[in-house]
Structures are given as structure tokens and as C-alpha cells.
Amino acid sequence: MSQSRSEMRENSSQQPKKKRKGLKIFLIIVLILFIALGLFVWKIYSDVAGTTEKIHKDVKTEEVRDSSVDISKKDPFSILLLGVDTGDLGRTEQGRSDTMMVMTVNPNTDKATMVSIPRDTRTEIVGHGTTDKINHAYAFGGTSMSVNTVQNMLDIPIDYYVEVNMKGLQDIVDAVGGVQVTSPLTFSYEGYNFTEGESTSLDGKTALAYSRMRYDDPNGDYGRQERQRQVIQATLEKVASLSTISNYQDILGSLENNMQTSLEFNDMVKIFNNYRSAAGNIEQVQLEAEGTTIDGIYYGIVPDEEMSRVSGLLKEQLEIN
């Protein structure tokens, strides 16, 4: 039996209502998801801001610029990366800077330059009145003396510093879920084995062993610095990837316990927005030193030509005379 016209009109009028109701439910679900996402993003933002506030520490250094760098205007800038061997940063023992790297970032050239400084480099220790290994600057006067000494040696300004406890590198690598590196040589250290040319997954303990070995490397301190750069760069890339969002709190916790920096949260946001592309294009440079023994102590002596070469590269990137 066919439907009456009144029944057909009633059914047809109900269909749009059902569609409108379904659309309304869908929009409510989308709204809830957006609110949840917004709260999650705000939670991350708040946690990151809180962590950067805790790890922020200004140090007094000699001013060598006529005017301070302005990263909001995309000025080229420099950072001194210090890997220290004091264990936890709160320990009384000062320790030494096991790793020293200077990075310049220039958005105009869309390039970053990272210079590794051999820790045995013989230079004037500014503020201590001695000529010694550059890594002793940290033992004598902490971050401030290290910054002043590097500024004096390379004849460039150091705008910011980042100090990382090298023993805490284990916690940081574990927090990002491990890193992948390709070993430049075959060696064994602290029970871990690495094969030349073979891609290897490193957890925290393995990364620490990989980046510490020195005496079995034919390139000595240079070889170790190369491996340290590998681990640091792989860790930075992992931190910047979306794959670490789920465990971001572990990452922040590891940074909070093992890192100090003169960068504030707003600085980091500006660098991310204005310098992201340049920071992803890193040129690795090694400051070459010639080994010698003075009064029974081994030093690395940097020839004047080499110092001028590296200093010139950094000045060019910083766009200073």
C-alpha cells in the first residue's frame, strides 16, 4: 500500500531534522577536540616555559659588542656550547669543560657554523692571569671565565651560552627515545662495541660510551669531538621532531636536571621562528691544533694562520669586521 501525501511530507520533514542533529553532534565533537588540543598545547607551552625559567641563568661576561644582538630583528648571533664533566650541575666540585663548541647562526645566509675547540688548546685564561688549557677556564672561573676566554681567543662576541652536564647526556638521550648514529671507526668501550660505517641505535648509556672514548681513536680528541657532535646533533633533531611530543615531560625533566643557559623562553621562541631554517643547515668546522709538550704537560697549539682562518669564518657569519 502506498504512503499518503501527508505521511510522505512528515517523513521528508524529519530527514532534514536528523541531518541537522547529526551535524550538530559532529560540530560539538570537533569543538571538544579543538578545546582538548588547545589545552594540550597550552599545557606543553606552560611546561616548556616553566622549565626554561628554571634552567635560565645569566652570567657576567665582558661586553665586546658595541650594541647587544637583537634576535627579534634577525641579527646573526653566537652561542657557546659547554659540555661539563662535573656530574650533577649542583655539585660543589667545579670540574672542567669536556666539550667546547661555538655556533654562529645567520638567517641572512641561511646557515649555521659550528666550531669545535680542542679541550687541550693552549690559550690565555682571561681573568686568571695564566696561559693554560682552555678547558681549565671552567675549573678556574666557571661559565663566565669560559665565555671570556673563548671571546678573547677567537676575537668574536659570545652572545649566549648553553651548558650541559655530559653525564646527564644519558638522561637526555633516553628521554628522546634514543638516537641513531653511524660510527666513523670500529672500537669497543666500556663493554659496548661499534663498527665503522654501521648505523647504530644508541640509548643513554651507549651514547655516553660512544661519545667518551678518546685514546683508541687515531684522531684522538678530534675523533671524540666528531662523535660528540654526532650525538648532540642527532639528539637535537629528535627533540625537534613530532615523535617526541608524547614524552615531552621526560625531555623537559632531563633538561631541567642537566642544563643551564642564558637564553630565556622568549629568546627560544624567537630563534625557533626566525632562525629555524638556518639552524638546520650546519657547517662543521674543526679548530686544528698541533700537539706539543711543555714542562711535561701536553697542549694543543693553534697556529696563527689557523686561528685567523676560523676567526674569520665566524666573523663573516656574524657580519662583523
Q: Language-model features: where?
A:
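Non-catalytic, solvent-exposed segments at the cell envelope interface
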Residues: 2-321
